[in-house]
Design a protein with these regions (language model features):
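Positively charged n-region of N-terminal signal peptides that target proteins for export
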Residues: 1-4
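Intrinsically disordered and other compositionally biased segments
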Residues: 6-7, 19
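Bacterial N-terminal signal peptides
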Residues: 7-14
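Extracellular/periplasmic carbohydrate-active domains that bind, remodel
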Residues: 19-474
Length: 474
């Protein structure tokens, strides 16, 4: 009995120690929105890391550059607490990471879980990137680059901090009602990580302007990821699967696998659920369901790649989507946004960063074609759409074995399906103003005869002809 009591006491002491709270003001944080609190917050995190404690804050606004959450630490932001990102790029240290599909050095995020285990970022508080200064610098650079044939370099040369980075880590949790707003670049980037849960985040990036490249949640060459209860309003892809770009992505060859995305709403974005355009490492065993997209989302489900990306997608399951006034229900493009996707260094430019060379490294044609197959899409309800389908695969590597079931779509136009092999439709209700254009009717089975027209190929619109703001949503 005495031994049992001693053991119970030891367990209670260990539990108490592991649950110890560390309050940031005790380490010098002011929370006045003016004083730079980076060092004080990091000291608090480092102290908590010694025994797996929780970092807490008094209500206030804590101006900060990059902070790094350590293994075993919970960063808890209660209601009334805001971590406000510094507008000085120098407050975000440059470090190795992956950006838009290539490994390179880039400013750290505002909140980082970098090569850690069992770290948590939760609470009903706010992480605010205050990103407009970075958005404006991007647009200035891009408008000078575009006429010089350097659209592809804009996103890499205009360095901007992400809001949260989970990099090469495992056992990470983010959520609990967090408000993530005004990110300078991507909002929540999960890269090279395993066993990550995002549960309960509100993302608002269209405040005070339209933030370019302000993706919602990017799952990048990672495995065993759950995203649920997300409420997203951004100016690029909302819920996005990525796996590397072109030669560098093919070199790394890390897939995104075993991902579940569910019970979320997308209010404004370039697309609701997106695969790509960074497809090089491939996607396997992805499921997304109970997703709602609204009028501010041009595309409900988007697959995008390019002739130099390569990669694959297999066993992808998308179901129980509700699309309300979302213009395009399903878009698949294997030649997405050419001015961004294909890096060509003008011959008159002799001095350029090393990553330009990485971006412009040629990829053999056969290796560059992404191959999507064994995709199941079912229980999609779309009302008020402009176009049902915009599907453009490769003639040499068609989109294979797509099964679409239980579709209930009302759209002004049927759109088109090109370079598809062994597509089957079943139990579909289509109310279309114009039929779906097919090149080869025998490759697509099960569509009502009245909803199909076989004929000449429909040429997709070149997004480079659109405004800068519209290009990224094409």
């Amino acid at each position: 009995m005495k031994k049992l009591m001693l053991w119970l006491c030891a367990v209670m002491l260990a539990t108490s120690a592991s649950a110890r709270e560390y309050e940031a003001s005790q380490f010098g944080a002011k929370g006045d929105g003016v004083t730079l609190d980076t060092v004080a917050i990091q000291k608090t995190i480092d102290a908590a890391a010694k025994d797996g404690g929780t970092v807490i804050f008094k209500p206030g606004t804590y101006l900060s550059g990059s902070i790094f959450v350590k293994s075993g630490v919970t960063l808890k932001l209660d209601k009334g607490v805001t971590i406000l990102g510094s507008q000085r790029l120098k407050d975000y240290p440059v470090m190795p990471t992956r950006i838009a599909g290539i490994e390179m050095r880039w400013p750290a995020a505002l909140v980082n879980v970098y090569e850690q285990r069992n770290a948590t970022v939760i609470g009903e508080g706010t992480i605010d990137g205050d990103g407009k200064i970075f958005w404006d610098s991007y647009w200035t650079l891009r408008k000078s680059y575009e006429p010089r044939g350097l659209r592809w370099a804009s996103d890499y040369d205009a360095q901007r901090p992400r809001l949260i980075q989970v990099f090469n880590s495992t056992g990470v949790k983010v959520g609990g009602g967090l408000l993530l707003r005004r990110s300078g670049f991507w909002t929540l980037h999960i890269c090279y990580s395993t066993d990550v849960t995002v549960d309960g985040v509100v993302i608002r990036n269209n405040e005070g302007g339209l933030g370019p490249s302000t993706d919602g949640i990017d799952i990048d060459s990672s495995k065993k990821v759950l995203v649920q209860h997300a409420d997203i309003d951004v100016n690029d892809d909302a819920l996005c699967l990525k796996a590397g770009r072109d030669s560098d992505g093919l070199r790394v060859a890390r897939s995104t696998e075993d991902v579940v995305i569910r019970d979320s709403i997308v209010r404004s974005a370039a697309a609701g659920v997106t695969f790509g355009s960074e497809t090089s490492g491939g996607f396997r065993n992805i499921e997304a369901y109970n997703i709602t997209t609204l009028k501010g989302v041009p595309v409900g489900i988007l697959f995008k790649s390019a002739h130099t990306r390569g990669g694959f997608g297999e066993n992808l399951r998308l179901h129980d989507f509700t699309m309300i006034d979302t213009p395009v229900v399903l878009r698949i493009t294997m030649n997405w946004n050419p001015s961004y996707s294909y890096a060509r260094i003008p011959p008159e430019i002799k001095d350029y960063p090393d990553y330009w060379k990485v971006l412009s490294t040629p990829v053999p044609k056969e290796q560059g074609m992404a191959r999507f197959h064994d995709v199941r899409i079912w229980n999609i309800k779309a009302k008020g759409a402009s176009t049902a389908f915009e599907v453009d695969g490769y003639t040499q590597a068609p989109l294979e074995r797509f099964a679409l079931e239980g579709l209930d779509i009302e759209a002004q136009k049927g759109g088109h399906i090109h370079d598809a092999a062994n597509w089957t439709f079943s139990n579909v209700q289509l109310k279309l103003g114009t039929p779906i254009a097919l090149e080869e009717g025998h490759s697509v089975q099960g569509l009502p005869a009245a909803s199909v027209q076989t004929g000449r190929r429909v040429q997709p619109v070149d997004p480079s002809k659109k405004s800068f703001e519209e290009q990224d949503k094409s």
